[in-house]
Amino acid sequence: MAAFAVDPQAPTLGSEPMMLGSPTSPKTGANAQFLPGFLMGDLPAPVTPQPRSISGPSVGVMEMRSPLLAGGSPPQPVVPAHKDKSGAPPVRSIYDDISSPGLGSTPLTSRRQANISLLQSPLVGATTPVPGQSMFSPANIGQPRKTTLSPAQLDPFYTQGDSLTSEDHLDDTWVTVFGFPQASASYILLQFAQYGNILKHVMSNTGNWMHIRYQSKLQARKALSKDGRIFGESIMIGVKPCIDKNVMENSDRGVLSSPSLAFTTPIRTLGTPTQSGSTPRVSTMRPLATAYKASTSDYQVISDRQTPKKDESLVSRAMEYMFGW
């Protein structure tokens, strides 16, 4: 029977890693846990590679793997990056204070802190950063934001809404018609008179819009449904609810002061309503009501003529007495 002697200098199984460069497993102490550290979410200890004297054909392989060794620079210790322990069991209480923000903070915590800082200073991003000055400096927080008016804000319909508040109640019977040339104002007014009884209309002296007041809200909604309609194959008209409080207040004040100026124009008897006396604009065009009346009326009123009457003077009586006339 042959006896095998064990060489005491020979490396035992498990003392040397299988491949070069693989990290060795950490040694467990006397009070080690039952589960290994990577299952509990612990970070592995940084491993510093130790230089070894290797001769033979494996030297070229090592030089191809690590070109830094050939340059002569000292090897840098491998520091593992922090990973989120979302899949590992908890290792501390949720009420414990985190002392190190780099190791204890998660991406969710850092994202929440960034959102809180942006909410606390909303005017930081509005100012233009100066070269050499931080955007999050306290000097930029108190500066007012400089806004540039857009083309929509320069529009008169947009600026009229700046004076409105949440407590204001607008009259739903008023609509604003815009987008027509000045020469076609009467034509557009005649077209919108077909959608309801127009109580009053106010035209702009220099602009391309007019405010129309209907008798009921239903008629105003019918006019609002014509927004974007093309009239005369060349005029696209826009219709919006009126937000000009001055026009509404002046109209109500004029009705209360002089009720005779409030002129109601039914479409069955009059095609184009005449302007009230409170309107400052003087119309130079011929009213269309005359031609419309003549074409729709069934009866024509003849003006009174000069009819002969009996002379009751003294001379006529004397002649009648003498000659028997």
From Swiss-Prot:
It holds the Pfam family RRM_Nup35. CDD domains: RRM_Nup53. One of its GO terms (biological process) is cellular response to leukemia inhibitory factor. GO terms for molecular function: identical protein binding; nucleic acid binding; structural constituent of nuclear pore. It is found in: Nucleus, Nuclear pore complex; Nucleus membrane. It is a peripheral membrane protein. The modification Phosphothreonine is found at T106, T128, T264, T265, T272, T274, T279, T307. Keywords: Membrane, mRNA transport, Nuclear pore complex, Nucleus, Phosphoprotein, Protein transport, Translocation, Transport. Its main location: nucleus. Functions as a component of the nuclear pore complex (NPC). NPC components, collectively referred to as nucleoporins (NUPs), can play the role of both NPC structural components and of docking or interaction partners for transiently associated nuclear transport factors. May play a role in the association of MAD1 with the NPC. Belongs to the Nup35 family. This is Nucleoporin NUP35.
